[in-house]
């Protein structure tokens, strides 16, 4: 049968071609200018906190290995609190369970804001950092498990090398004087935030034991009241500084105490309280365009407390390990626990993050932003291998505070974080000249509208 001219033309017509102005999707682009400013402010605050964190850890190590080390351990193990409520804890435990809940409260605020109002609410911008963070959790966990596969006792520490310490990482950036472009800083912070979310989930599901249903259910009452008041009177709590301390803080403390009594690690309460805070302003208050929401206001109020007090005190009580001289250090580093942690953080993190990012770019036919090369992703991936605060916490949950494996795990965490910081320094310092050019490019505003051109190009692309 002969095809008609119309049918033949339809059959023979070439496949549609993409529009001439179509561009491949960019990975590690600049995102929005507002998000860049916000994250830049967060990282500047974390730089000071990171310096305090490192100083606290160094002081603890020196004190724990000095002739007066007994006084350090006596201070760390000194108990205080109300025993009938199961709250008679050592100072070290108060730092881990209590003060660190403030850190996780901020994590909850940051996570909710990123997924409600930040760049992560857009799938095309969130898929790469979220997937890279997942790869940066999975590969280190597998490497640690492979090293400790024949020891069920030490295998419990598989989650130790999964988290990234953003405060420590940005402190390293400040020390080496890196001009890391904002797009890479945003990528690093996003990795750390998603890492924290995964770590919180791991702590809640794998490191909670003897869960008591009654206090857990009771905790829902103050938590629900806290959420209702924060949502209903968000403008009031944002405008009146002391109101949140007088009304919301007691509800938060009761929630924390009941979660602690339930057997679930109390830091999870901090995350839940952070999730309960509204991100956007209500319509009655002018909506999102009228100014920062309650979550951002609380973040400004609590970040100095977290970065300047809570996390450094936790590091002080957690990082103090009696190494026992060079012989003791060698023994600690020969433990499969320490070997697994070092290999997981120094090798597993870069492999997981960079490998996942590379696979995604190939699978989606995306490309890196023209300002960056794969060596830049590698440098940031090395920085992500600095696992400190959450890693120290998971080590204590895995092996018990002050146990031999716990001490060896902490030595491994410290050694791995130091090694990752040194390697990241070598890579990123070598690229500083290119980063300075990118930094200058970020300042160009040819149309004088207050928004640098790179962010406008990003939004149009």
Swiss-Prot record:
GO molecular function: sodium:proton antiporter activity
Stretches the record annotates as Disordered: 1-23
Organism field: Arthrobacter sp. (strain FB24)
Protein name: Na(+)/H(+) antiporter NhaA
Disulfide bond annotation, renumbered to this chain: none
Catalytic activity entry: Na(+)(in) + 2 H(+)(out) = Na(+)(out) + 2 H(+)(in)
Family: Belongs to the NhaA Na(+)/H(+) (TC 2.A.33) antiporter family.
Segments traversing the membrane: 48-68, 89-109, 127-147, 157-177, 186-206, 211-231, 236-256, 257-277, 305-325, 339-359, 374-394, 408-428
Keyword Membrane on entry: yes
Entry's localization field: Cell membrane
One of the GO biological process terms: regulation of pH
Function description: Na(+)/H(+) antiporter that extrudes sodium in exchange for external protons.
Keywords: Antiport, Cell membrane, Ion transport, Membrane, Sodium, Sodium transport, Transmembrane, Transmembrane helix, Transport
Main location: membrane
């Amino acid at each position: 049968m002969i095809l008609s001219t119309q049918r033949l033309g339809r059959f023979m017509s070439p496949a549609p071609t993409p529009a001439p102005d179509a561009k491949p999707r960019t990975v590690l682009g600049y995102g929005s200018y507002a998000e860049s400013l916000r994250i830049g402010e967060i990282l500047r605050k974390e730089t000071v906190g990171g310096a305090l964190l490192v100083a606290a850890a160094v002081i603890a190590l020196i004190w724990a290995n000095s002739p007066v080390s007994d006084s350090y351990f006596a201070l760390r193990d000194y108990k205080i609190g109300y025993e009938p409520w199961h709250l008679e804890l050592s100072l070290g435990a108060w730092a881990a369970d209590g003060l660190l809940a403030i850190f996780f409260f901020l994590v909850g605020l940051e996570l909710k804001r990123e997924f409600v109002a930040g760049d992560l609410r857009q799938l095309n911008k969130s898929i790469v950092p979220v997937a890279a963070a997942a790869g940066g959790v999975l590969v280190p966990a597998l490497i640690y498990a492979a090293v400790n596969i024949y020891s069920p006792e030490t295998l419990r520490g598989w989650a130790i090398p999964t988290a990234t310490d953003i405060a420590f990482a940005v402190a390293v950036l400040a020390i080496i004087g890196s001009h890391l472009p904002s797009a890479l800083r945003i990528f690093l912070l996003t990795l750390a935030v998603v890492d924290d979310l995964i770590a919180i989930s791991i702590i809640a599901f794998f490191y909670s034991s003897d869960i008591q249903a009654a206090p857990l259910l009771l905790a829902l009452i103050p938590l629900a009241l806290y959420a209702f008041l924060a949502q209903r009177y968000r403008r009031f709590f944002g405008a009146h500084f002391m109101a949140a301390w007088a009304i919301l803080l007691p509800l938060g403390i009761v929630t924390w105490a009941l979660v602690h009594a339930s057997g679930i690690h109390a830091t999870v309460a901090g995350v839940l309280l952070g999730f309960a805070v509204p991100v956007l302003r209500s319509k009655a208050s002018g909506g999102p365009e009228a100014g920062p929401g309650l979550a951002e206001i609380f973040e400004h109020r609590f970040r100095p407390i977290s970065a300047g007090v809570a996390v450094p005190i936790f590091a002080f009580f957690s990082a103090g390990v009696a190494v026992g001289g060079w012989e003791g250090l060698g023994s600690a580093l020969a433990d499969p626990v320490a070997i697994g942690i070092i290999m997981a953080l120094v090798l597993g993190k870069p492999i997981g993050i960079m490998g996942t990012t590379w696979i995604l770019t190939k699978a989606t036919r995306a490309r890196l932003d023209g300002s960056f090369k794969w060596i830049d992703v590698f440098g940031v991936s090395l920085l992500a291998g600095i696992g400190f605060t959450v890693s120290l916490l998971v080590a204590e949950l895995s092996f018990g505070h002050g146990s031999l494996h716990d001490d060896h795990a902490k030595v491994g965490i410290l050694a791995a974080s130091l090694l990752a910081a040194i390697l990241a320094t070598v890579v990123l310092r070598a690229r500083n000249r290119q980063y300075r050019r990118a930094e200058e490019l970020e300042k160009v505003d040819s149309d004088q509208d207050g928004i640098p051109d790179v962010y406008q190009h990003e939004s149009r692309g």
